[in-house]
């Protein structure tokens, strides 16, 4: 995994939330810092994500929002208005999709407030042809009760053609 400090915000947020992640085998790859990660099960807790941390994880906020829905406590995401002008309006879509799956999510002008809680349930969702939305909610669907269907889910091929194959391998 790339661990460049300008792009490692997801790793920092995971640790803030209580994730048990060890960084191993640090090295240079294509002139960038990289490492292997050892991730072990841990209960996650809510946190505040804002300010200078946002640019280091702007593309990972959809999956962080999914994590927050399963975490204990409240997660507040602020200063993320840039998500409104990505491949889709990711802020609105994330709120809508999490709510459709039963999460307690309140939109704000520049982010959202997510109250983690009971297990989510399956839902019919639209990728909006946004690969990060499709991948994030595929993960949410796996961790939820019932079936989740994502339309145009093959949009993940733009960035991660083997995503579904790799995700399925984690189920076993």
Regions from the PLM with identified roles:
Residues 1-172:
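Short, structured segments at the rim of ligand-binding sites
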């Amino acid at each position: 995994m790339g661990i460049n400090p300008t792009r490692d915000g997801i790793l920092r947020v995971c640790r803030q939330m209580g994730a048990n992640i060890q960084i191993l085998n640090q090295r240079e790859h294509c002139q960038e810092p990289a490492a292997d990660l050892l991730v072990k099960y841990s209960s996650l807790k809510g946190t505040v994500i804002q300010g200078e941390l946002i640019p280091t994880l702007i593309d990972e906020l959809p999956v962080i929002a999914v994590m927050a829905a399963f975490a204990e406590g409240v997660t507040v995401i602020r200063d993320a208005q840039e998500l409104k002008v990505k491949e889709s309006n990711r802020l609105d879509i994330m709120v809508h999709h999490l709510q459709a799956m039963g999460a307690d999510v309140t939109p704000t002008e520049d982010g959202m407030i997510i109250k983690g809680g009971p297990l989510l349930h399956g839902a019919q969702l639209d990728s909006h042809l946004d690969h990060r939305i499709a991948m994030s909610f595929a993960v949410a669907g796996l961790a939820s009760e019932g079936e989740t269907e994502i339309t145009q889910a093959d949009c993940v091929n733009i960035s991660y053609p083997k995503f579904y194959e790799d995700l399925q391998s984690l189920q076993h």
